[in-house]
Every structure is written in structure tokens, then in C-alpha cells.
């Protein structure tokens, strides 16, 4: 067993509606059961977690992201840009914790800490667009619009099913997004209802890819072509209830595993990258052998 002696927790002070600050002393105390040095630092502003990870990654054996997928995105970017190679840990304390779910890390804090104490690790691939590292997903389309249209109030009240409610509201506003996608040399020029590149099992809190291999050098590519609005909606419901395998035979659906891809966004549509809304016209992405990460 490798001797890990130092661990840094980088946490979002807004996590758990601000209550994470009360739990940090308890987290540190439990981690002292295994690590001789346990430190915690909070991200004070946008990109704060990335800056902390970049500055301190080389000084710790383990760097832990404590927050949601957005905090993890920053921590991974800071670590990758630093050139250091600490093990990455995750304490899922945010609104969206897709990566932690894919790794089997429990939402309950005590059990998530148990994972850090066990130090059971796996290789985890990272996508890279030449400037920024993408931890687990990039997506666009109708389903994405319904994701960021879901209000915080509805998410608190209905949980992940808030996205279904939002999707119903967006049903008759379905956009037809013209894109050109090149995947490992194969070119697709289509008007789409949905597009996703995913490393892992979960997106939006739903298990879409069962038993996904997060370290095989490839990511899952899913494209749903724009057809009839109602048919597209039924395809969406089926995918989010039963996973992408359930729609693989649909004529409007393309599913592949890819190593490199390029997206040409002809309509300047909004994308969701690791849970954050962005816009771009063109993006070339490669899948890299990324980090060592703690799993269940």
C-alpha cells in the first residue's frame, strides 16, 4: 500500500447551502486517522479553486475537491496545469455531483470520507480543448436547455425530476441546432435535438451509461437528430430513464466511443461544459490520460 501522508481539501464555502464550513473541522479530524498532514482551503472567488490547486498541487499527495462538479472542474484544471500528479479526491457537497456518482462515491458525507480513508484509486481520463480541461461532459440541445431552465427552487423541491418538469415546458420550443461533428475522422453534418460527449456514467443526476470505463482513453458520443418534437421528447425520456443503450437502435440516434472530436457550432448555441453554460463557434477536443482519482 502506497504511503500517502498529506492531503489538501479545497472547498466551496457555499456548498451545502453554506453549512460545509461547519463540517470542515470534523472532516479534518477524521482524515487524521490516515494522513499526518491535513489542510483545508476555501475558494474565495471564481476560479479560486483552480488557483489553489495550481499553487499547492505539488505540495500534497492528495488534493480533494469539496463541492459540486463545478468545483471539481476547477480543481482538475489547476492540478493538470500545474504539472504535478497528486491523487484527486471528491467530497460531493454541491447541487450537481455527477462525477462522484459515476465513481460510486456516496452523497452522505461520512461515507464519502470513508472513501478518502480507503484510498481505492482508478485512472480517470480528461478531455482537453487546447486551453481548458473538461472533467466529464460537454453537451448541447433541447435537453441542455431544459437543464439550465430548471430553477433552484424546483430543484430543491423535486430533485432531479425538476429537469423533467422543465423539459415538459420546453417541449414545444424544441430548437433545431445545425452542427458539424468530426469524430476520429468521421464527419456528421446534422440538425440536432441533442448532443453529448460524456466520460462516466452520470449526467444531470441520471445514470446514462452503465458500467462506463472512465480510463479507457475514450468518451461516449451521443447525438439525437432533430425529428418530430414529440418523438424527440419520448427519446429523451427513454434515455434518461433507461440509459443510452435503450435508444441505440433509434434511427435518429448515433452512439459511439471516440478519442478525438471537433464541434462546429453553426448557430452559436449554448453548451453545458461540466455543468456550466458556455458558448463557442468551434472546439477541438482530445481525450487525454488524465489523473488518478479516488473511487468507492
Question: What residue ranges belong to the model's regions?
Answer:
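A generic structural signal for short beta-strands and their flanking turns/coil linkers
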Residues: 175-177, 191-193, 215-220, 257-259
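ATP/NTP phosphate-donor binding region
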Residues: 1-66, 78, 186-187
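Catalytic core of DAGKc-family lipid kinases
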Residues: 10, 34, 43, 81-196
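Gly/Ser/Thr-rich active-site loops/lids in small-molecule metabolic enzymes
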Residues: 154-162, 207, 211-231
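Glycine-rich phosphate/pyrophosphate-binding beta-alpha loops
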Residues: 139, 196-209, 277
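ATP/nucleoside-binding phosphotransfer catalytic cores, i.e., glycine-rich phosphate-binding loops
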Residues: 183, 189, 213, 223-296
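Short, well-ordered alpha-helix to beta-strand connector turns
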Residues: 4, 35, 60, 191-192, ...
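Short Gly/Thr/Asp-enriched flexible loops that form oxyanion-binding sites at enzyme active sites
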Residues: 71-83
Amino acid at each position: 500500500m502506497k504511503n500517502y501522508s498529506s492531503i489538501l481539501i479545497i472547498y466551496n464555502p457555499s456548498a451545502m447551502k453554506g453549512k460545509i464550513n461547519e463540517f470542515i473541522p470534523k472532516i479534518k479530524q477524521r482524515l487524521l486517522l490516515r494522513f499526518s498532514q491535513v489542510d483545508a482551503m476555501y475558494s474565495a472567488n471564481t476560479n479560486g479553486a483552480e488557483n489553489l490547486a495550481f499553487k499547492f498541487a505539488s505540495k500534497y499527495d492528495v488534493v480533494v475537491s469539496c463541492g459540486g462538479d463545478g468545483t471539481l472542474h476547477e480543481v482538475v484544471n489547476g492540478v493538470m496545469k500545474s504539472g504535478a500528479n497528486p491523487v484527486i479526491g471528491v467530497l460531493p457537497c454541491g447541487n450537481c455531483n455527477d462525477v462522484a456518482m459515476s465513481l460510486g462515491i456516496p452523497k452522505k458525507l461520512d461515507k464519502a470520507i470513508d472513501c478518502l480513508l480507503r484510498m481505492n484509486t482508478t485512472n480517470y481520463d480528461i478531455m482537453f480543448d487546447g486551453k481548458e480541461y473538461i472533467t466529464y461532459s460537454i453537451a448541447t440541445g433541447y435537453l441542455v436547455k431544459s437543464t439550465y431552465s430548471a430553477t433552484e427552487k424546483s430543484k430543491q423541491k423535486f430533485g432531479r425530476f425538476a429537469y423533467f418538469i422543465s423539459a415538459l415546458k420546453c417541449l414545444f420550443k424544441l430548437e433545431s441546432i445545425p452542427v458539424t461533428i468530426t469524430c476520429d475522422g468521421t464527419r456528421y453534418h446534422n440538425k440536432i435535438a441533442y448532443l453529448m460527449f460524456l466520460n462516466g456514467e452520470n449526467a444531470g443526476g441520471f445514470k446514462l451509461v452503465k458500467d462506463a470505463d472512465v480510463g479507457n482513453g475514450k468518451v461516449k458520443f451521443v447525438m439525437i437528430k432533430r425529428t418530430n418534437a414529440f418523438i424527440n421528447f419520448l427519446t429523451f425520456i427513454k434515455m434518461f430513464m433507461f440509459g443510452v443503450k435503450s435508444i441505440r437502435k433509434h434511427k435518429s440516434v448515433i452512439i459511439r466511443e471516440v478519442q478525438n472530436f471537433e464541434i462546429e457550432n453553426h448557430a452559436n448555441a449554448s453548451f453545458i461544459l461540466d455543468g456550466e453554460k458556455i458558448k463557442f463557434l468551434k472546439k477541438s477536443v482530445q481525450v487525454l490520460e488524465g489523473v488518478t482519482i479516488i473511487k468507492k
